[in-house]
């Protein structure tokens, strides 16, 4: 039977991608249905109890700037906040927070259940309704059919998921949850390229069996960072430390002597694992010269005794896991409460997607999260928001939207996936972005909130706060530009006391702030330039904008040159065999990838600058050279 009411957008899956997709579509006013196999696991942290990190924190800030959920949820659930790379430049500084799993899940569910235009329904999906190469709905396991104009697949590791512990394996979407086998089979019938990937998780330890007295503590930062541009530190719950231990030669001997029982090394697992989050088996074998590896013991929550040992993801048998755990300092009597495991699952080649994350072959079908070959909550959330907003726009007969590489880490993520694809779980790093200085955590709202408002993602409260911040920045910069001190002025002595070289000519507040030894905080304690802004976010922007003004202007020039290529569109139906002068290799790669623009084509491995020139000349001769607005 059909459900009596149609929907504009259906989201399948309630993880980090699905929840952001559902919230985005509903915020834009579209009638949205979130289908999940279990309402109680909405927003579940399946692996590590943390949000953020290098590159990842940037994505969280961008999701927040577009009105998303993740940053708000972690501000309510974070039990330790830190700024990584704090001693480095602002481009690579990143926020990271340990999470209380229960509080995080509660924050997500509360937001979902109070979001207008959003209905949540508990049923696993087993089929899609596809008519004339267009998706028009979904079918649940009890045969209930839902109609919609767009469907977003955010199914994580559930598609034909297989869990491995030692040489034993069984079907599962994650520990304790069933896999989605019928939906996997249905998707394999569609004209989509499919592969297998693998990820893993460490055993969880009973905190009562660890001797923390012999371990180093790691505390959070004070003052505490905040993730959301709308948040404040008073929202954070109680803060707790993490602890540090290490593997040792005994640990490594245990691992080496049991590799024949590892499903990875025994050839049982086909899927490729994450390069940047390797199992402890991989670490020991790949870095054979290392006699120890640092392991962070992270609390899973304020009311839980479970500890997440970050750094020993493993699929070795349980008895070997026990030996590994008990070989480390402080863990000699430790007890495992959940075994570690590896999970294999289906993913679909993201090169078959448009930059909006809509399928090139099935109209109205969007993909987001691990199904696209990524790993990580943050990467999933960012894709979910993009897929959700574009599903909403499609259902409202509007053009899709996707950020450029120069606009957001989300743009880098989507361009990498859709242009290059991936053969291993993709993780975001700041090193993947060419324009890091422009794509900082601190300016995510300045880059994206206005766009979010135009798209219908940003509410009135956020918009008012954003405009107030803009006004504070502009007013303060004007004040510093127009406030001067001369070498002969009475205030010069006070200023000179904070400079490595005394004033030799008249200087404005901005001139002084450009000096390496001067900070905004210090400058605004000096009589001519006091008082400081009370808006800390605006104050941070003033300092960064002034100090890096020249570098930012130079990078902006580079971006404008590159945009000419990004905006030169390539016909979706173009057969590159028609273009005389291209090598067979280039023709094959262009026909395989079907890039949307000259910019995308130039990033495909093997497509040379000479080939791009030939292509541009050919397009011009054919009268097909056109640029997007």
From Swiss-Prot:
Q: Where in the cell is it found?
A: Cytoplasm
Q: Which residues are involved in binding NAD(+)? A: 273-287
Which terms in the Gene Ontology molecular function aspect does this entry carry?
Answer: flavin adenine dinucleotide binding
Q: Does the keyword Flavoprotein apply?
A: yes
The protein's matches in Pfam families, at most eight in alphabetical order, are given as: GIDA, GIDA_C_1st, SAM_GIDA_C
* Cellular component terms (Gene Ontology): cytosol
Family annotation (PANTHER family): GLUCOSE INHIBITED DIVISION PROTEIN A, PROTEIN MTO1 HOMOLOG, MITOCHONDRIAL
Name the family the entry cites. Answer: Belongs to the MnmG family.
| Quaternary structure annotation from Swiss-Prot or TrEMBL | Homodimer. Heterotetramer of two MnmE and two MnmG subunits.
Question: What is this protein identified as?
Answer: tRNA uridine 5-carboxymethylaminomethyl modification enzyme MnmG
């Amino acid at each position: 039977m059909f459900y009596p009411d149609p929907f504009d957008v259906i989201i399948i899956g309630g993880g980090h991608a699905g929840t952001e997709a559902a919230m985005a579509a509903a915020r834009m006013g579209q009638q949205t249905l979130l289908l999940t196999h279990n309402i109680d696991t909405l927003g579940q942290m399946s692996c590590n109890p943390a949000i953020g990190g290098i590159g990842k924190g940037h994505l969280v800030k961008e999701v927040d700037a577009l009105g998303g959920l993740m940053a708000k949820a972690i501000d309510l659930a974070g039990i330790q906040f830190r700024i990584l790379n704090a001693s480095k430049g602002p481009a690579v500084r990143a926020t990271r927070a340990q999470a209380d799993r229960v509080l995080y899940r509660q924050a997500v569910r509360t937001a979902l259940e109070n979001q207008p235009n959003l209905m949540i329904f508990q049923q696993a999906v087993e089929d899609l309704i596809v008519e004339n190469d267009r998706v028009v709905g979904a079918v649940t396991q009890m045969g209930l059919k839902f109609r919609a104009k767009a469907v977003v697949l955010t199914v994580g590791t559930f598609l034909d998921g297989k869990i491995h512990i030692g040489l034993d394996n069984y079907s599962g979407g994650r520990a304790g949850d069933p896999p989605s086998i019928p939906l996997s089979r249905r998707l394999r019938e569609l004209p989509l390229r499919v592969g297998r990937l693998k990820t893993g998780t460490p055993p969880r330890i009973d905190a009562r069996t660890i001797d923390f007295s012999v371990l180093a503590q790691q505390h959070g930062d004070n003052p505490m960072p905040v993730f959301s541009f709308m948040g404040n530190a008073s929202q954070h719950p109680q803060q707790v430390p993490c602890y540090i231990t290490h593997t040792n030669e005994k640990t490594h001997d245990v691992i080496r002597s049991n590799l024949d029982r590892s499903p990875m090394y025994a050839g049982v697992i086909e899927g490729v694992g994450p390069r940047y989050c390797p199992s402890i088996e991989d670490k020991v074998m790949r870095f054979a010269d290392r006699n120890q590896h640092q392991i962070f013991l992270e609390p899973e929550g304020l009311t839980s005794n479970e500890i997440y040992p970050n750094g020993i993801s493993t699929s070795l048998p349980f008895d070997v896991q026990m030996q590994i755990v008990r070989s480390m300092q402080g863990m000699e009597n430790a007890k495992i409460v959940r075994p570690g495991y590896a999970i294999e699952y289906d993913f679909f080649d993201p090169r078959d997607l448009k930059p909006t994350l809509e399928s090139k072959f099935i109209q109205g079908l969007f993909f987001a999260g691990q199904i696209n070959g990524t790993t990580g909550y943050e990467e999933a959330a960012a894709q979910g928001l993009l897929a959700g907003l574009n599903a909403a726009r499609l259902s409202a007969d509007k053009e899709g939207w996707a950020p450029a590489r120069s606009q957001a880490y989300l743009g880098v993520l989507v361009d990498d996936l859709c242009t290059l694809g991936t053969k291993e779980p993709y993780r975001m790093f700041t090193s993947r972005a060419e324009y890091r200085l422009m794509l900082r955590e601190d300016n995510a709202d300045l880059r994206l909130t206005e766009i979010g408002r135009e798209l219908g993602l940003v509410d009135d409260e956020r918009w008012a706060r954003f405009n107030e911040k803009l006004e504070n920045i502009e007013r303060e910069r004007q004040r510093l530009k127009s406030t001067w001190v001369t070498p002969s002025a009475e205030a010069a002595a006070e200023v000179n006391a904070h400079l490595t070289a005394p004033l030799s000519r008249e200087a404005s507040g901005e001139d002084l702030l450009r000096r390496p030894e001067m900070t905004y905080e210090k400058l605004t304690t000096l009589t001519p330039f006091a008082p400081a802004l009370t808006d800390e976010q605006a104050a941070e922007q003033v300092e960064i904008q002034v100090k890096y003004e020249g570098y930012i202007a130079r990078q902006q020039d580079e971006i404008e040159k590159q945009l000419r290529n990004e905006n030169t569109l390539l016909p979706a139906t173009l057969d590159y065999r028609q273009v005389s002068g291209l090598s067979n290799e280039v023709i094959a790669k262009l026909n395989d990838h079907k890039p949307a623009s000259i910019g995308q084509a130039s990033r495909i491995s093997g497509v040379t600058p000479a080939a791009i020139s030939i292509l541009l000349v050919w397009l011009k001769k054919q009268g097909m050279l056109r640029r997007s607005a």
